[in-house]
Amino acid sequence: MARYLGPKLKLSRREGTDLFLKSGVRAIDTKCKIEQAPGQHGARKPRLSDYGVQLREKQKVRRMYGVLERQFRNYYKEAARLKGNTGENLLALLEGRLDNVVYRMGFGATRAEARQLVSHKAIMVNGRVVNIASYQVKANDVVSIREKAKKQSRVKAALELAEQREKPTWLEVDAGKMEGTFKRQPERSDLSADINEHLIVELYSK
């Protein structure tokens, strides 16, 4: 499945919630009727079956983190193999992706922008360049911007925007040095309550 390259707001409208694909800070512009489905007048939303609700939740989370279908299914399989709650394990794996950590640290205004920084070799982990967006960041890993990328206006703009966001408690960021430490995996209480990972587990458990 190819990565979606169309309008970002359309995806958020389809899922009925702000996926933070367009802006890393402010909610979607009020001109965008988030509760209205895509289309000139917004298609009437049919009443979903249990399967439909589960599928929509999976699509929402997958799009939020910018993960393709096969990747997402593999994350679920890995989460199911790990000890503990499968749904929480899944979210921890998604949060541990390098592109997501770069976004959470404020180096990218969106996850897509953070992914681009990674692929363009602008990101280092423990002093070594890593250009794989799905790289799993571990506890106490230090993520930083390469020296030659520190002058990029988009990085500076992203850091300014990040000042308006709530600081993740599982990260420690030095904006001046443009580096941060992944102190620990986030706990479920640290993450958005808007995600219902139990629906995803139910979907894949069938």
Curated annotation (Swiss-Prot):
It holds the Pfam family Ribosomal_S4. GO terms for biological process: ribosomal small subunit biogenesis; translation. GO terms for molecular function: rRNA binding; structural constituent of ribosome. It comes from the Bacteria. One of its GO terms (cellular component) is small ribosomal subunit. Residues 96-156 form the S4 RNA-binding domain. CDD domains: S4 (cd00165). InterPro entries: Ribosomal_uS4, Ribosomal_uS4_bac-type, Ribosomal_uS4_CS, Ribosomal_uS4_N, S4_RNA-bd, S4_RNA-bd_sf. Keywords: Ribonucleoprotein, Ribosomal protein, RNA-binding, rRNA-binding. PROSITE patterns: RIBOSOMAL_S4 (PS00632), S4 (PS50889). The keyword Acyltransferase does not apply. One of the primary rRNA binding proteins, it binds directly to 16S rRNA where it nucleates assembly of the body of the 30S subunit. With S5 and S12 plays an important role in translational accuracy. Part of the 30S ribosomal subunit. Contacts protein S5. The interaction surface between S4 and S5 is involved in control of translational fidelity. Belongs to the universal ribosomal protein uS4 family. This is Small ribosomal subunit protein uS4. It comes from Klebsiella pneumoniae subsp. pneumoniae (strain ATCC 700721 / MGH 78578). The gene is rpsD.
